[in-house]
């Protein structure tokens, strides 16, 4: 088995967690769409929530069970749920579309804000878990 292969039970946990995460992302983005001027701000919001929550969960796991590594809970919630709740590819497409529409400042704010905001959100989640 190659280093990239994942046992079926682990892949199943990721898949089971991914379904509600993707569903929630779709629901939140569709709910926010009429309230915000551009669809990408819904994606921004779910990415920030997912980054915060993933930082919190990973820090709690490291604090409570540091030796467990990629535990079933991390595979289910961290990789599956929060991995599908957040979406880097949609973020990248939305930045590109904003650039194509010649909205340079908005594209810059979206790109930099997403990256820095994501880092700050993870740090806040870690801080909450450790504080």
Curated annotation (Swiss-Prot):
The keyword Chloroplast does not apply. It comes from the Bacteria. The keyword Transmembrane applies. Na(+) binds at residues 83, 86. GO terms for molecular function: fluoride channel activity; metal ion binding. The chain crosses the membrane at residues 4-24, 40-60, 73-93, 108-128. It catalyses: fluoride(in) = fluoride(out). One of its GO terms (cellular component) is plasma membrane. This is Fluoride-specific ion channel FluC 1. It comes from Prochlorococcus marinus (strain MIT 9313). The gene is fluC1.
